Amino acid sequence: MINKLSLLLFSMLCYTLFFRRFSIAVSILFLSCCCTRIYSQQLINSSSSDQVRLETTESKIESILSLMTLKEKISMCHAQSQFSSPGIPRLGIPELWMSDGPHGIRAEINWSNWDYSGWTNDYITAFPALTCLSATFNPDLSNQYGTSIGEEARYRKKDVLLGPGINIYRTPLNGRNFEYMGEDPYLASIMVVPYIKGVQMNGVAACVKHFALNNQELWRGHINVEVSDRALYEIYLPAFYAAVKQGEAWSIMGSYNQFRGQHCSHHKLLLNKILKTDWSFDGVVISDWGGTHSTKEAALNGLDIEMGSPINNDTSPRQAYDANFLGTSFLELVKSGEIDERILNDKVRRILRLIMRTTLDSSRPLGKINNIEHSQVARKVATEGIVLLKNEDDFFPLNPAKKLTIAVIGENAIKSMTTGGGSSELKANYEISPLEGLKKRFKNASIIFSKGYSSEATNQSYKSLIKDALITASLADLVLFIGGLNKNRGQDCEAADREELKLPYNQDYLISELQKVNPNIGVLLVSGNAVSMPWVSDVKTVMQTWYLGSEAGNAIADVISGDTNPSGKLPFSFPVRLTDNSAHFFGELSYPGNGETQYYKDDILVGYRWHETKNIKPLFSFGHGLSYSSFKITDIKSDKKIYAANDSINISYKLKNIGSKDGAEVVQVYVGKTNSQVRRALKELKGFKKTYLGSGKQTTESITINITDLSFYDESISNWNIETGGYTIYVGSASDNISKVLGINLK
């Protein structure tokens, strides 16, 4: 049968070559034979025909698959350039084009190396980093963010956006934490779903990363993570589960690290069982770049597209990738029968499904880029994500009408934060620095600047920089120190971790000296990570401002001036010292490991779960964030006292803005199990709601919790289990600021 089909195809090819001028007639003939590109193209575009509208995407995929040669199938399973995988031109199947990253579309990269292409039309809007988005505690804003970045990806003709990142914040030293959504799996789950839906409504696939347990950059390419099943399912997988089941993500990126001795980009348990079987994921698994290590492992254990640089650079650029693991060696294993072609077909089906959802979706919009709406979304996310940690004597807001001399000290007041950081580096259409934003908003003030420290080589000594800063501070009515971390390697940057919790470049000393010269000082921290603050009791205010993207300076000025009332909440805890963090409490085998393996000895007690359960007071707690107003939560109650397994818990409350300014508060609901038979955290976030209220206004709100959300992963049955008996419900405005405690029972 195969020989007859091959003969038929060869005859048809000859027919085409000899009768080109009769191509239309030939195409009709070929269509009737169901063997040509025109037939496959009609299958692809059949949604435009009433007669074939009922034909499902899956039947189209099967029809196209039947027309593909073995070599064509293989070609779709690996890259053809740094950021694309090949199509099948003869069948009208287009290429797939991918792009970093989660908070902006990366500038164009050369076909076969990592140099930038030097285009003049690849400038984009830089959105705030995902730590900032998570700090908004605002799912609606997450959807606006995803929609906007999806529009920019679509305009740049990208089919797959390599983001969002949702790895759990386990250690404050992780160089890539700024790309993720914090330490709590529930918060990350709630925030990631609308982001994905926003991206994909543009016909662009979200590629959720990095699956899984990629919680540090140090030794990320090989470190083997050992963690309990319970911690895996309760802490490190829930956000990915939400991305797949509620967000309906079209692609997932495997991580570099190993888990239980197997690389995660081709992992039997993670990809074949959990993702594709248990969760019924029908999308594409894409390797992290260079994260593939074995043809057999990749073929058999769930990887669909291998991405990364070519292994063989001695051939033409388009052929260089054939030498990669899912290239020629995969082809030979299928030809020999060592690997069943059905395994290959499953990969190709998934890739075709992705293509149908993206580049072959004729209804997808054209996209937009660098428009005012995107700038507005970026600014809104930035202002809502800024977290006011401390505000002694109402230091903020500052009155823009007042004639003040303001000393702005610190390199981060002028340093670009859209460049650097690794693969998330951006080529922003514009970037307003904090100093620019302040000068624009505070036109009546005299703003004087001194760098104070430098992260780069300079002809000034650090002592000279400090001396100049102290002189500047002494001349001012107040000091705004704008420092923190940056995107340099060893700070908030891919491929390396920080070495310590303290601020770099002698900033702790500088802040202490500035306070002595001018005690009227506020500190603005730019970072995606927690830092230690030995000077915290000596300064008036501390504000966490993250990496805010194009609108950074405007957003900071909005909040400092009081144009926007801060409402951000911390998505991770700030420990007093490094050993207060759960990953570091257990020594180097827990973090960073011994160079080969690390053991997650903190198990399920990550972040605030550790602080609360072990009664270790953090510097600033998860969920903490101040406002220029004050809010009161009253009349807190549950709808029942006793619940059945299929019930939902409804927590109602009254929220009143008792301050003089309009603002927003995030009411947070935590739940803990009383007298549990297994180890459990004192409390876990199970619900939250952000509410905007005018000064003096009051509203009645409610938060619903599904009983199933009270379950734990029971390793004895390898499944979720719910304990009956008493539970404690904590309602407040932060994990350590609880307004009322309720007791309920589950029968």
Language-model features: where?
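Glycoside hydrolase catalytic-domain context in secreted enzymes
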Residues: 41-712, 719-736
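Bacterial Sec-dependent N-terminal signal peptides
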Residues: 1-47
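Short beta-strand elements
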Residues: 738-747
